[in-house]
């Protein structure tokens, strides 16, 4: 079968031939439909994130996938059922407390592998196998965009955890801001716009730009951070009740605290490389304590977040899905899915269709 992988000798994505996998007991065989490409895939390729499976000379890429059950293998799934796979798996097949309680997304380093990212092959192949417990049903009506379930699940978890910090009191947020106008940021912006009176999105793009067009269509305010840095949002626009960071730009973590309103919460999802810079720690501490602000980090997601994401996917407007997916390519031309450019928002590798 055809797979897209990265080898220890090559930097870019490679079209490889590998044997079709056979499912173990408790696993199903899935025929892949589409796999999305995101920033993490680029980080895996350049070696700044993730790692190869033990002893392997290559790793199959891809963690945003949708497929069709080819062989249920006695799992209780049905042949022809559309599913989206979660990402984290038990390390070396051995369970631990995080997997036993259904919270693999809360496991520390070394207590998990991640398909297509850390220590385990991904889904960018014509077929893959997975334990049935990690396959989430997706309605056929949205199968074409089922690869978005994984990124949507990341936001479902981030929002859940951020809002949980405000549950002890009567929090009445009106304004939300997304830092980053990539595909994840734009999906999140639409989600937040359904909840908040006013929404903003911070980016670094000149008009005309397709991502800014989406921001405008959603009805949000675009903020160019070259003109208005994040910590100047309160003066230029307003202090924010909720800030969702999806840039990986390290200063944004600290600028978020300044940009939050009284009782506000910020959630960090970007993964920056090491970067030393000066921070006024006293003022930062003061802002958090005296104004009841909160800053949290979150990564990955689990089955319940995938299930919530499936519901959200069914609510996304057709125009947003059409505008968001800018490249659909086959495995033979996978390089197109990894090209960076101002017109590229969300790229997809298509292996098959329903």
Curated annotation (Swiss-Prot):
<dbReference type="GO" id="GO:0047935">
    <property type="term" value="F:glucose 1-dehydrogenase (NADP+) activity"/>
</dbReference>
<dbReference type="InterPro" id="IPR026583">
    <property type="entry name" value="Glc_1-DH_arc"/>
</dbReference>
<comment type="similarity">
    <text>Belongs to the zinc-containing alcohol dehydrogenase family. Glucose 1-dehydrogenase subfamily.</text>
</comment>
<dbReference type="GO" id="GO:0005536">
    <property type="term" value="F:D-glucose binding"/>
</dbReference>
<feature type="binding site">
    <location>
        <position position="300"/>
    </location>
    <ligand>
        <name>substrate</name>
    </ligand>
</feature>
<feature type="binding site">
    <location>
        <begin position="204"/>
        <end position="205"/>
    </location>
    <ligand>
        <name>NADP(+)</name>
    </ligand>
</feature>
<feature type="binding site">
    <location>
        <position position="150"/>
    </location>
    <ligand>
        <name>substrate</name>
    </ligand>
</feature>
<dbReference type="GO" id="GO:0070401">
    <property type="term" value="F:NADP+ binding"/>
</dbReference>
<dbReference type="GO" id="GO:0008270">
    <property type="term" value="F:zinc ion binding"/>
</dbReference>
<keyword id="KW-0521">NADP</keyword>
<dbReference type="InterPro" id="IPR013154">
    <property type="entry name" value="ADH-like_N"/>
</dbReference>
<dbReference type="GO" id="GO:0019595">
    <property type="term" value="P:non-phosphorylated glucose catabolic process"/>
</dbReference>
<feature type="binding site">
    <location>
        <position position="114"/>
    </location>
    <ligand>
        <name>substrate</name>
    </ligand>
</feature>
<keyword id="KW-0862">Zinc</keyword>
<feature type="binding site">
    <location>
        <position position="40"/>
    </location>
    <ligand>
        <name>substrate</name>
    </ligand>
</feature>
<dbReference type="InterPro" id="IPR011032">
    <property type="entry name" value="GroES-like_sf"/>
</dbReference>
<feature type="binding site">
    <location>
        <begin position="181"/>
        <end position="184"/>
    </location>
    <ligand>
        <name>NADP(+)</name>
    </ligand>
</feature>
<keyword id="KW-0560">Oxidoreductase</keyword>
<comment type="function">
    <text>Catalyzes the NAD(P)(+)-dependent oxidation of D-glucose to D-gluconate via gluconolactone. Can utilize both NAD(+) and NADP(+) as electron acceptor. Is involved in the degradation of glucose through a modified Entner-Doudoroff pathway.</text>
</comment>
<dbReference type="Pfam" id="PF16912">
    <property type="entry name" value="Glu_dehyd_C"/>
</dbReference>
<dbReference type="GO" id="GO:0047934">
    <property type="term" value="F:glucose 1-dehydrogenase (NAD+) activity"/>
</dbReference>
<keyword id="KW-0479">Metal-binding</keyword>
<feature type="region of interest" description="Disordered">
    <location>
        <begin position="91"/>
        <end position="110"/>
    </location>
</feature>
<dbReference type="InterPro" id="IPR036291">
    <property type="entry name" value="NAD(P)-bd_dom_sf"/>
</dbReference>
<feature type="binding site">
    <location>
        <begin position="298"/>
        <end position="300"/>
    </location>
    <ligand>
        <name>NADP(+)</name>
    </ligand>
</feature>
<dbReference type="Pfam" id="PF08240">
    <property type="entry name" value="ADH_N"/>
</dbReference>
<feature type="compositionally biased region" description="Basic and acidic residues">
    <location>
        <begin position="7"/>
        <end position="22"/>
    </location>
</feature>
<feature type="region of interest" description="Disordered">
    <location>
        <begin position="1"/>
        <end position="27"/>
    </location>
</feature>
<protein>
    <recommendedName>
        <fullName>Glucose 1-dehydrogenase</fullName>
        <ecNumber>1.1.1.47</ecNumber>
    </recommendedName>
</protein>
<feature type="binding site">
    <location>
        <position position="38"/>
    </location>
    <ligand>
        <name>Zn(2+)</name>
    </ligand>
</feature>
<keyword id="KW-0547">Nucleotide-binding</keyword>
<feature type="binding site">
    <location>
        <begin position="269"/>
        <end position="271"/>
    </location>
    <ligand>
        <name>NADP(+)</name>
    </ligand>
</feature>
<feature type="binding site">
    <location>
        <position position="150"/>
    </location>
    <ligand>
        <name>Zn(2+)</name>
    </ligand>
</feature>
<keyword id="KW-0119">Carbohydrate metabolism</keyword>
<keyword id="KW-0520">NAD</keyword>
<feature type="binding site">
    <location>
        <position position="63"/>
    </location>
    <ligand>
        <name>Zn(2+)</name>
    </ligand>
</feature>
<feature type="binding site">
    <location>
        <position position="64"/>
    </location>
    <ligand>
        <name>Zn(2+)</name>
    </ligand>
</feature>
<dbReference type="GO" id="GO:0070403">
    <property type="term" value="F:NAD+ binding"/>
</dbReference>
<dbReference type="InterPro" id="IPR031640">
    <property type="entry name" value="Glu_dehyd_C"/>
</dbReference>
């Amino acid at each position: 079968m055809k797979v897209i992988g990265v080898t220890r000798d090559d930097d870019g994505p490679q079209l490889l031939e590998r044997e079709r996998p056979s499912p173990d007991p408790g696993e199903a065989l899935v025929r892949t439909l589409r796999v999305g490409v995101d920033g993490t895939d680029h980080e895996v390729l350049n070696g700044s994130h993730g790692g190869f499976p033990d002893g392997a000379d290559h790793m199959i890429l891809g963690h945003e996938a949708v497929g069709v059950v080819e062989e249920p293998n006695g799992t209780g799934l049905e042949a022809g059922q559309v599913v989206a796979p979660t990402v984290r798996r038990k390390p070396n097949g051995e369970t631990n407390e995080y997997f036993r309680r259904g919270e693999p997304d809360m496991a520390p380093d070394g207590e998990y592998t991640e398909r297509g990212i850390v220590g385990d092959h991904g889904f960018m192949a014509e077929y893959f196998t997975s334990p049935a417990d990690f396959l989430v049903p997706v309605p056929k009506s949205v199968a074409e965009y089922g690869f978005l379930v994984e990124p949507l699940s990341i936001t479902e978890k981030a929002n859940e955890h951020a809002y949980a910090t405000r549950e002890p009191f009567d929090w009445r947020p009106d304004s939300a801001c997304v830092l980053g106008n990539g595909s994840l940021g734009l999906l999140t912006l639409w989600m937040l716009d359904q909840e908040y009176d006013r929404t903003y999105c911070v980016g670094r793009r000149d008009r005309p730009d397709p991502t800014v067009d989406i921001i405008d269509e959603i009805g949000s305010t675009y903020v160019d951070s070259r003109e208005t840095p994040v910590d100047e949002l309160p003066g230029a626009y307003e202090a924010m009740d909720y800030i969702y960071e999806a840039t990986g730009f390290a200063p944004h973590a600290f600028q978020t605290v300044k940009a939050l309103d009284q009782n506000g919460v910020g959630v960090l999802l970007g993964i920056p490389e090491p970067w030393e810079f000066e921070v006024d720690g006293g003022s930062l501490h003061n802002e958090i304590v005296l104004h009841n602000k909160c800053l949290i980090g979150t990564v990955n997601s689990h089955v319940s977040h995938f299930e919530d994401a499936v519901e959200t996917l069914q609510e996304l407007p057709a125009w947003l899905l059409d505008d968001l997916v800018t490249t659909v390519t086959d495995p033979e031309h996978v390089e197109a899915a990894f090209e960076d450019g101002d017109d590229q928002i969300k790229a997809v590798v298509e292996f098959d269709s329903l």
